[in-house]
Amino acid sequence: MSPQTETKASVGFKAGVKEYKLTYYTPEYETKDTDILAAFRVTAQPGVPPEERGAAVAAESSTGTWTTVWTDGLTSLDRYKGRCYHIEPVPGEEEQFIAYVAYPLDLFEEGSVTNMFTSIVGNVFGFKALRALRLEDLRIPVAYVKTFQGPPHGIQVERDKLNKYGRPLLGCTIKPKLGLSAKNYGRAVYECLRGGLDFTKDDENVNSQPFMRWRDRFLFCAEAIYKSQAETGEIKGHYLNATAGTCEEMIKRAVFARELAVPIVMHDYITGGFTANTSLAHYCRDNGLLLHIHRAMHAVIDRQKNHGMHFRVLAKALRMSGGDHIHAGTVVGKLEGERDITLGFVDLLRDDYIEKDRSRGIYFTQDWVSLPGVLPVASRGIHVWHMPALTEIFGDDSVLQFGGGTLGHPWGNAPGAVANRVALEACVKARNEGRDLAVDGGDIIREACKWSP
């Protein structure tokens, strides 16, 4: 009797470990308009050829496993497998290269960012043949984009709702982020909105803690919104964080916000999850609420240069899942952000069509086919002296959000808000008159000081 470990030729396949490149490395493949394309930065273990590494990524993120299985014969692998179709070296990095992988669209559930990420990045990042792996970019085909509803409203609808045009919007995160009572929290909201800001914001970790339950916060913030609107004649908002421990509780909070007739709610989309985020986006679209998105936990995923995912991928995913604002870095504040790279994914959030531009980190041309745009939010570590640079870098379709840069004003919250509004309007006016904000920014702010506390 032959050993049980042997496989007879009549079975139709040979068991054992198989080189991935024999099946999944296809340099002759011409990508289809319907393929999802991915650019991976691969850092492999020594001694493994690049073709095998790239093929391994394609296999383990699609139909492959470590051996041939008999059920391979029951389907069409050529139809469903991912393909590594191109490999290019990374300049200055001997052990790294970019592997381009094409995935057939049939591998993905329609309208599900969750399923897309589960397939592409859910398993392969723990593959021991790779020392590190980073997803640099995705090309989402038009056929897949059209299965998503995207942002609840988008940039133009938001401006129409707020009746605010021709300038960036101004926001402020209430500080201290934790510990205030609901009434004192609402007072700070009122002072900032009354001083000239368009929005105030819950911090990402303000949910419903013992010192301030969510319902109390919502009520006092709504009162602050109504009062400031009545006194200024402008539409105001506060990002009421609806993030919760369950989707049901999250929706309950959003329903209460709608009953209070406030304009906007907020979600922590990475910690909350893409399924929850898409559910909330659908509710906001159906009920006239704007949706502000915070990216809490993003640096766990995107901070390392050779492992994880670049934020441009998370930004694309958010535009598909749904959100009207998302934090996008500042370039000039206290958090990391290279100018050209940051502007690359800012354009991916706002524009309908973006050409491939490797100098800005954009690996693929992306056509959003009129999926609504997302306002990038510049936040953290910024103040009025950054206003000229922020106005020049981000342009009008953005939210400039100052926390300590408002509440840290020596005369108080309202004067801090006035200072921000005066600085912004001075910069916009100077820009419209043809002045160079990069050259004259300091003078513009100094000239504006006489109109501001």
Curated annotation (Swiss-Prot):
Active-site residues from the entry: 175, 294
Underlying gene: rbcL
Cited PROSITE patterns: RUBISCO_LARGE
Broad class of enzyme this protein falls into: lyase
Chain positions with N6-carboxylysine modification: 201
Name the UniProt record assigns to this protein: Ribulose bisphosphate carboxylase large chain
Site (Transition state stabilizer) location in chain: 334
Chloroplast as UniProt keyword: yes
Sites of N6,N6,N6-trimethyllysine modification: 14
Cofactor or coenzyme needed: Mg(2+)
Manner of cofactor binding, per the entry note: Binds 1 Mg(2+) ion per subunit.
First-listed, main subcellular location of the protein, grouped into a coarse class: plastid
Subcellular location: Plastid, Chloroplast
SUPFAM superfamilies per the UniProt record, alphabetical: RuBisCo, C-terminal domain, RuBisCO, large subunit, small (N-terminal) domain
Classification via Gene3D superfamilies: Ribulose bisphosphate carboxylase, large subunit, C-terminal domain, RuBisCO large subunit, N-terminal domain
Keywords associated with the record: Acetylation, Calvin cycle, Carbon dioxide fixation, Chloroplast, Disulfide bond, Lyase, Magnesium, Metal-binding, Methylation, Monooxygenase, Oxidoreductase, Photorespiration, Photosynthesis, Plastid
Organism listed in the record: Rubia tinctorum
Record PTM text: The disulfide bond which can form in the large chain dimeric partners within the hexadecamer appears to be associated with oxidative stress and protein turnover.
Its EC number(s): 4.1.1.39
